[in-house]
From Swiss-Prot:
One of its GO terms (cellular component) is extracellular region. Its main location: secreted. Belongs to the pleurocidin family. Residues 1-22 form the signal peptide. InterPro entries: Antimicrobial12 (IPR012515). The modification Arginine amide is found at residue 43. Keywords: Amidation, Antibiotic, Antimicrobial, Fungicide, Immunity, Innate immunity, Secreted, Signal. This is Pteroicidin-alpha. GO terms for biological process: defense response to bacterium; defense response to fungus; innate immune response; killing of cells of another organism. The keyword Lipid biosynthesis does not apply.
Length: 66
């Protein structure tokens, strides 16, 4: 009997929650972020960015010695 009452109370809490307060929105947003990160890793976007930064550092070092 306690389990049934607990189930009904929790069901009402979930149904009465505002859509903006939903935890599912955060989960879905996190999944999209993870998917984009994996996609960027596969395509090598971060690798190109790191390579560009390394070239800029080398250029700055050469300019400092000149």
């Amino acid at each position: 009997m306690k389990c049934i009452a607990l189930f009904l109370v929790l069901s009402m809490v979930v149904l009465m929650a505002e859509p903006g307060e939903a935890f599912i929105h955060h989960i879905i947003g996190g999944l999209f972020h993870v998917g984009k990160s994996i996609h960027d890793l596969i395509r090598g976007k971060n690798r190109d960015m790191a390579e560009q930064q390394e070239l800029e550092r080398a250029f700055d070092r050469e300019r400092a010695f000149a």
